[in-house]
Amino acid sequence: MTLLKAKGAKLIGVADMDEFAVDGMNRGVAVAIPVPAYIVENIRTAPTMEYYQMYHTLNEQLDNMVEAGAEYLRGQGFNARAYTKKSLSVNDDLRTAFPYKTVATKAGLGWIGKSCLLVTEKYGSAVRLSGLLTDAPLVPSKPVTQSRCGNCQLCVKACPGNAIIGTNWTAGMPREEILRAHVCKETQIARMKQILGFYEGERICGRCFAVCAYTQKYLRQSSSVASD
């Protein structure tokens, strides 16, 4: 955990992954780093090139982080596999073999918001995620199993594609009850082409997580610290 913090992880948790175990590796380590507040401030209405560039920078940082973590665990005699952004493929149903958000909820980092993004107490949804699997006997964190969004509808109203259904999540709930994932995808692509002038395979939008009440709390706290 110390190594991951040194590499920039701001949130770290351990998940019991017995039901998703691979080659005996039944512990998932979830890590998160926040999107800088100044980036989030500028994407409440539309994606920006600044955000697009930061998106790639943070993904690369996360890849390096979990690769270093897995290498360290292997050096200690355990099996470990880093699930980097560059190694994971997205299938036609927009799913991956290692669902970062599911691992993060099981590791206690946060819950799934109405936007179908992870929501954390400290940073809201303004986080990027990654993780690894290992058979090291790590003590699991307390999982989060219920939404804390309540009656909030900010992300639902902000979505330019009306892709967010507005359901409060509980662990195990099908994604289809929360988000029209393919509508979200097509909206992201269309907005990137319209606003940024290109689409090269990586999709961004950001409105839903930028307006999130928990994200807004993070922005206010960041502004307060900066002004002190």
Give the residues covered by each predicted segment:
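Non-catalytic, usually N-terminal nucleic-acid engagement modules in DNA/RNA processing proteins
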Residues: 1-64
